[in-house]
Amino acid sequence: MKITFYMWASYCSILKKALDELKKEGVDVEYKIYSNRNPIDDEFLEDAKDYDLVFIYRTSSDDIDLEKIKKFNENVIVVAQDPNFWNSEKSAKCYLFITYGGLDNFKNMVLYLMGKDKDVVKHPFQGIYYRGKIYEELEEFLKDVEFNKKYTVGILFSRHYLVNDDMDVIEKLLNRLDKEFNVIPVFSYGAKCEDLNALGSGESVLKYFLKDDKPIIDALINLLSFPLGTVKDKANLNKISGVEILKKLDVPVFHPIMSYYKSYEDWKKDEQGLSADIGWTIALPEFEGVIEPIIIGTTENENGLEKKFGIEERIDKVVRRIKRWIELKYKPKKDRKVIFILHNNACASVEATVGSAAHLDSFQSVINIMKKLKEEGYYVENIPENGEELAQLIMQKKAISEFRWTTVNEIIAKGGYLYLMDEEEYYEYFNTLPENVKNKILETWGDLNGKDIPAGMIYKVNGKNKIVITGLKFGNVYVCVQPKRGCAGARCDGRVCKILHDPYCPPTHQYIASYKYFNDIADIIIHVGTHGTLEFLPGKNVGLSNECYPDICIGDIPHLYIYNSDNPPEGTIAKRRSYATIIDHMQTVMVDAFYEELETLDSYIEEYLKEMDASRRHQLEHLIVEEVKKTNLLKIKEKIEKIEKEGKIHENFKEIFDELRDILEMIKNSKCNDGMHIFGELPSGEKRVEFIKSILEAIFIQNNTMNSKRRGIAERSEAMHPGYPNRGLPPMEFEYKDKNLKKKVSDVLNGKSIEDKKLEEKIKDINERIEKSDEIGSLLRGIDAKYIEPGPSGLITRGNYDILPTGRNFYSLDPYRIPTKSAYRVGVLLAEKLINRYLEEEGRYPENIALYWMASDIMWADGEGMGMILYLLGVKPVYRGGRVVGLEVIPLEELGRPRIDVTIRVSGITRDMFPNCIELVDEAIMKVANLDEPLEMNFVKKHVVENLNKGLSFRESTFRIFCSPPGTYGNGVKYAVYASAWENDEDLKDAFIYWNSYAYGKDVYGKKAINAFENILKTVDLTFNKVVTDEYDLFGCCCYFGTHGGLTNAARVLKGEEVKAYYGDTRNPNNVEVRTLKEEIERVSLTKLLNPKWIEGMKRHGYKGAGDIAKRIGRVYGWSATTKEVENWIFDEIFNTFVKNEENRKFFKEHNIYALEEIARRLLEAYQRGLWKTTEGNIEELKRAYLEIEGDIEETYSSIADIGEFQGGSVDIDMIWKEKLMSNGR
């Protein structure tokens, strides 16, 4: 008999083996096997015509035209998990043959298809597999297998591998584990099915890894790519979720991964690592708190037959890391060595920014943890009194990297080093690294004597090189500052900034040596705050190899990461690339940005609007003008001063009044953070009231988005909890924004009852969640190697209070639900507002809009920006069950306008975390490019034709999504700006193009496409980004000015014309706004940077607050350098507020003089470059202040005989990077 099979790829090998054995046994069968990895094609149909039977085992999503197949062969049997697809009386039994599986059942199925009566062999659906033997009961296994090791590890793997004879990965893992541990390898069918006597994965965990309701393993390796599901508790019949099951085990759950689509060679050379696998092999399991997705297997494919094969070196890595975790668990607390890594924003000044952590007081957080460790019995001594004392101790000892004001000689003299690593010791380790890694490091940095520039952090002792590893020791607790990663020496310029001209720049010798030292001396490493550089070092996106720098540096040491619960994009990168277990922390309390100094002015304005009496209105005009003069609203003050000189204050009052009202309304409609969060501390008193009030206001906004009280949060709940819709938040039915909300919150917290019972219940619920937050307790559980419960992440200011309680190992969302329906609708509004504003200002449609598409759009806003991109193109998503399953082109007559072209600079995190979203947008672009429409109504097609005429291929002409090179993160421009390594806009354009001209899409990944990028940028009419929350703004990170600013500058330079820059605002999705970039810079300056309320909040945090202020001012300078959109009054007011103001200057000098130096230096540079035009008096005063600061810093060297060479405050414009750029193939 001749049979053609169309099978799931994973069944093809076992089926072939069965058929070949039958032939050897004399059975007359001929066969052809096709894998469902490929759709049914003409070759299959031709074969079907010549065979006796066509057998199809399909999935519910396979696109199979059964009627078409029957035209070639009517004898077709279809089998599927869904009985609705069965078409034959034989389908049911064939399904059982396949489901029970194994060689015997596949042989019997073939014989059954040939007309022989064969029974299904009923193999168990769960059990313990060990050394070729299956045990269905735990007791039987424990009696038969001797446990002679100290620790026990469980493995949970899919029965599918066992019955399909695809066990290479499992066997290799088991063999390696056997050398170190007792092992309990459990196989499970996954889903519970009583008809098959299949318990399901969750119940299998309870059956085989617990005895007498107590765990018998120290760690679990979960190789499943689907949730454990829920089981019924036998005691009370309640359902127990997968997370509750793992909490019963209370051990770390490791999740090594396999590539289901790539061979070993493909994976090894692929810069992406994994791609299509990410959603279901990594993202979904993270919902149950699994950790460390290290790849251990790939799929080899030969003639359509697939087998999984283990990667022994990666398996070895997994086992070594598990061993370190278990050893940590059993080590006495008094002997455990803990190392805290504080981050450092080197480009924004090493000395000014120690302890960088978004919205977290990292120093006080570490002190709180150290004190708790001591209480718990850890050996911790000489704990500083508070966080400020810790910060000052680090700076007094200079336990940091070299920079403009810090030399190695100073570090050594002041005792800021932990260890001096001998050259021999370092090279013994260095020589164990892969050959191409060593070569790249040596090519970039040379040996320990340096290359082009002296090697960083090297101290010579008796003529021998010693690598200086900095930090402070407090008994068995170490506090270290993360080393610099892309530059070296006591300078910051275009010569030492190697990363400026090399996105693949490896970390320095000292960086690698430091992490090697951390691995050797400590039992666990804890990175403090969002975020550092480790997880962003070059390497694969996910599924890293031993040639990827995060994998090299983290080594085998257990890794906990204190991370802001509002930042899932970057936190998820840390989980997947540096094997971090996240302990998330609460977000900052957000308060109304309106401040006391404006209240009298506001009351006059309110009175003026109501007053009808002309004389009183005239009097109020005087009062308003005088009151403005008392504020820091410099822009209005300057206008008033000019008009007063002309004697026309009353004639021009309406113009002043309208602008003043707009400014005050803008401040009223904004919030600012009240200082920073301190890890382990809960907001109390007034802060607790403000915190809950801001959450309730956000719930009101989200539940009423697009006139739907429930849609937004319901959709987010399903995206955040796929398969668990009831785990999300119930909607809150507000009918209006309550003006008395603050009092009501306060009353409930003080035990009073209020009339609105639903609101009262909600306040109590949020308050209870806050109280349950036990951040330090969770961290201590992590150090004890226990299970850290997972939880959702995102913005509280978007109503997502399900992120409470904090102290959890957060997860992201289901990427295939993006954009949600409500997010797409917001995107439509945003697109319409932007187009209409441009139409009003320019009188024509924009042909090409260049956008900065950040991962926060997906993680915080469910893809509003992505929805906007699709709608600009005239495309909409097609949904099935809440998931995006395709795209539909909107007809031109329905769209009512031309299709707008888009040029997208996507963030590296979006590229790596959401490849499906990248591919979907690229598919939309391709669809539009291929439409048969007039060029004047389809700007995508118009620009494709233009590029074809310039000699580009069709695919190159459709490249619209660009990013940095694969495995790298950054934009290039920020390095040039911070290092002062630029002379004109052309230089910044060159840096941007060099770093960002790599195309991404459905069939292209990181293809260098400079011509395509430059050509499409020449057609750009405007650039765009958006704000979704007041927690983060365009001064909040250097990526904003580096990418959006860099994009704007590049478009302007290449086009040779003005390119407008706009900013969208979806903080309130019911009231979407579009502003110019200049207006957004003004808004953020007034509501935060120059806001006395915000400044006082920062000042409460001493050194850390001063550093954060300086960083934001550096980004103001960055925006001015890249776009020239910062008005003079903003620089003037920065000078007045932070340098000229005696009280604030004193604060900086006492707490962080380096932050003050950085502020003053950037102001001087802005003036020297013509970015800031101000009075000679201001400049003279600034120069005097700077000389005083310089003198104060230099006094700190007085006790050091030989300080060595350092740059200090000079601005040295070194353009050697451009020569390197050209030699690197610009």
Curated annotation (Swiss-Prot):
Coiled coil: none annotated. One of its GO terms (biological process) is biosynthetic process. InterPro entries: CobN/Mg_chltase. Pfam families: CobN-Mg_chel. Belongs to the Mg-chelatase subunit H family. This is Uncharacterized protein MJ1441. It comes from Methanocaldococcus jannaschii (strain ATCC 43067 / DSM 2661 / JAL-1 / JCM 10045 / NBRC 100440).
